[in-house]
C-alpha cells in the first residue's frame, strides 16, 4: 500500500482491472465516483480474453467501455498499448529499444503498443488475433507464428532476437 490508500468515498482515481467476477453494484459505485470527479484508470483495454477451448470472457476493456458510456468520461489506460506501460517494462528489464521484443496475441494492444515504441514484434496466432484478421490493420508485426511454442525453434528464436530477416514481415508455420 506504499504511496496510495484505498478509500470508499471521494477517491482521486477509480482503477478498473481484470476480474473474474463483477457485480453491477460495483459498476454503479465506480460510475457514481467518476461522475463526482474521480478519474478513470484502466489497467488495459482488451475487449475480451481467450480462456481456452475456443471460448472467451469479457475483458477489462468491455467493462471500461460500459463505464465510459455511462459517465461520458474517457479512461486513461496504463496497460497495452500505452507507451507508459511499454516504457516502464523496457526500463525495468534494463533493455535498449532495439533489444526489446514483444510477443503477443492481440494486434490492437500487444503489437500496436510495442511497434509504436520501436520494439520487435511477434504475433502469435494462438490467441485473439487470427490470420484472417490481419488485413484490417494498417500495420504489421515483424514476425507471425502459429504458437508461442514455435519460439522454442532455435533458428527462429535467433532470427527474432537479431531481427535479421530478408523481409519486414515473416510468416512462419
What spans do the regions from the language model cover?
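Asp-based, Mg2+/Mn2+-dependent phosphohydrolase catalytic module
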Residues: 1-173
